């Protein structure tokens, strides 16, 4: 019995020594690795900082779709804003070519990119507050930090992977409709959003429902992409979507950012799992 107790005490002493090493050395090694990865992610978002000089560079992207050639054009991205748009729309009814372009004095902020960037910045801030000189005293303290960092990274990723669901009146009321010169025709709506690593542009063509129409008017709810036949009320008019044209372009640095988020989340989870292994040995006391 005494031998077994001594062996148990020795095993516990070894585990406690390993756990102290985990808290004092390995945790900080993981935090350094996380900071390095997230700083790379922040560079993709062109985070403003004291070393940043001048505006973010402009990047031109050609819009395309495998299913239609009704819409062609380019979008110019400058950091988290669309600075230019040059779009040609072939109208289905008469094949007339309609040219849409942003006003020169306007930029359209992409809130998804801005929010994702802010969440990355917050994650970096949380990690920087626990520098090499900080001594973690318990596993619970590490878990709390990892949970906070993972929350910011999950939110950053979600902003890029989950576009907002908007109703057609919300799209019609958006400031994006006032970005164009000449003004958008009243029978067109335009929406722009990020989906994963793609910048998507959707053009909705509308027609008015006559008061004598026998169609059962049923306003559409919110959606990322509305379908032909979707109805809504705008002002004194009832309108229906007749055609939908969606084109997109791949933004390579968004793909990089998503990869960095995934790798960082995996590192956080691996550290949490290591803490959990030790906690299972002495779950009856704080760890």
Swiss-Prot record:
Localization annotation: Nucleus envelope; Presynapse; Cell projection, Axon; Perikaryon
Protein name: Protein rogdi homolog
Keyword Cytoplasm part of the UniProt annotation: no
Swiss-Prot/TrEMBL GO biological process terms: amelogenesis; bone mineralization; brain development; circadian behavior; enamel mineralization; gene expression; hemopoiesis; locomotion
An annotated GO cellular component: dendrite
PANTHER family: LEUCINE ZIPPER CONTAINING TRANSCRIPTION FACTOR LZF1 (PTHR13618), PROTEIN ROGDI HOMOLOG (PTHR13618:SF1)
One Pfam match: Rogdi_lz
Keywords: Acetylation, Cell projection, Cytoplasmic vesicle, Nucleus, Synapse
Nucleus among keywords: yes
